[in-house]
Amino acid sequence: ESQRLGPNDRQQVLATLNAAPEINEVIFSGGDPLAVNDRLLAQWAEALAGIPHIKRLRIHSRLPVVIPQRVCDALLGWLGNSPLQKILVVHVNHPAELDSDTRKAFARLREVGVTLLNQSVILKGVNDSANILARLSEDLFDSGVMPYYLHAFDPVAGAHHFDVSDQAAAALVRALMTRLPGFLVPRLVRELPGETSKTPVFTGDNQANISVT
C-alpha cells in the first residue's frame, strides 16, 4: 500500500530488480495485494513490464473468492493491458465457496489472460476428507482453476482445533492420488520459519523433499 511503500521505496525495489537479471517473476502477496487500489497496482505492473527480464507477475489473493465483485473493470483493465504473464493464486478451501459469482469472476479473469491456480489449507472438520478435497479439485478445474498447493496446517494461536497432523494430511494426498489424475492432485507443502519458499511434506510417494515456490 502507498502508506507502506512510498515512491522512494518503489524506485529502490525497481532498481534492485533491474540489477538482478536472474529474477524473472515478481510475486504480489500479503496481507492481500488486491486490497490495494487498482491505480497503484497498475503503476506497479507497468513499471515491472519495463524491466526486460521480468516475465511473470504472480498475485496471491483470497478476495476473488470472498468478494468476487473485486474482479471489477479496473482490475481487469490493467491485467489485460499488461504484457506480463499473469498468474493469480486464489485460496479456496471448500467446494461450497465456489458459487456462481465466484465462477463468473474466474471466467472474467481468464478472458484477460490470467492463469488461475489454487492453494488450500487442510482444516480439521472443514475439508479433512478425501471426498471433499477430490470434489474441490474437480470443481476448481471445472471453473478454470488448477489445483496447486495443499498446505499442511501451521500452528496459529486460537486455531488449534483446525490442526491436522502431517501423517493424516499425507494419507489424504495418497487417497487423492487414487481418485484423481495427477494434474488435479495438489502438492502437499508447509511454510517453515526462516525458509524463503514452501517445503513439500513427504507423502510416501516419490515427491522429492525440496523447496518450491
Language-model regions, residue ranges each:
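C-terminal accessory regions of radical SAM enzymes
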Residues: A171-T213
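Short glycine-rich or small-residue beta-strand-to-loop segments that form or flank ligand, phosphate
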Residues: I27-S29
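Canonical Radical SAM [4Fe-4S] cluster-binding loop centered on the CxxxCxxC motif
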Residues: E1-N8, I59
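Conserved AdoMet/S-adenosylmethionine-binding subsite of the radical SAM
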Residues: Q11-E25, L34-L180
